[in-house]
Amino acid sequence: MKIKIQKIHPNALIPKYQTEGSSGFDLHAVEEVTIKPHSVGLVKIGICLSLEVGYELQVRTRSGLALNHQVMVLNSPGTVDNDYRGEIKVILANLSDKDFKVQVGDRIAQGVVQKTYKAEFIECEQLDETSRGSGGFGSTGVSKA
C-alpha cells in the first residue's frame, strides 16, 4: 500500500519501518516538549497523510517508552481516519514522577495501518444469551474465592 505524505514542518521525517518484520513504524517529534509528571502533552509529528478508503492509522505506545519512562499514548490506540487531512499529533501521558523531555527527532509513538470495517447496526428487543452474560470489568479474569 502506498500512503501519500505531506511534510508541513522542516523537522518532519517520513515514517519508515525499522525491520522487515515490523508492523509498526516510528513517528518522530518535530519540536521540543516537556511533559510534567502525571500530566499530558501534545506532540506534533509534522506530517499529514492520505490513507486509502477502508484503512485507518492507529497511533500506539512504544514499548520502550512505557517500560523505561512510564510514558504512553494516552488514547492508545489513537485513530487517524482515512478522510482526516490535518497534522498528525500524539497525546502523550507521563505517568512518572519526573519531567519527560521530548527532543526534535525523538521516536515518540508508532503507527500501524489497519483495515477497517463498516458495521450495520440492527436494533432488536433482546440479545442472544451467552455464558458470560452481562459480566464486565474483570468478570472473566479473577477467581472467586
UniProtKB/Swiss-Prot annotation:
Q: Which GO terms describe its biological process?
A: dUMP biosynthetic process; dUTP catabolic process
- Keywords assigned by UniProt, alphabetized: Hydrolase, Magnesium, Metal-binding, Nucleotide metabolism
Q: Name one Pfam family in it.
A: dUTPase
- Please name the GO terms that the record assigns under molecular function: dUTP diphosphatase activity; magnesium ion binding
Listed cofactors: Mg(2+)
- EC annotation? 3.6.1.23
**Span of the signal peptide:** none
Q: What is catalysed by this protein?
A: dUTP + H2O = dUMP + diphosphate + H(+)
- Pathway named in the protein's UniProt entry: Pyrimidine metabolism; dUMP biosynthesis; dUMP from dCTP (dUTP route): step 2/2
Residue positions annotated to bind substrate are R62, S63, G64, N75, T79, V80, D81, K89
**InterPro entries (UniProt xref):** dUTPase (IPR008181), dUTPase-like (IPR029054), dUTPase-like_sf (IPR036157), dUTPase_trimeric (IPR033704)
Role according to the record: This enzyme is involved in nucleotide metabolism: it produces dUMP, the immediate precursor of thymidine nucleotides and it decreases the intracellular concentration of dUTP so that uracil cannot be incorporated into DNA.
Give the family this protein belongs to, as stated in its UniProt record. Answer: Belongs to the dUTPase family.
Q: Which HAMAP family match?
A: dUTPase_bact
List the protein's name: Deoxyuridine 5'-triphosphate nucleotidohydrolase
Q: Which organism is it from?
A: Helicobacter pylori (strain P12)
What gene is this protein a product of?
dut
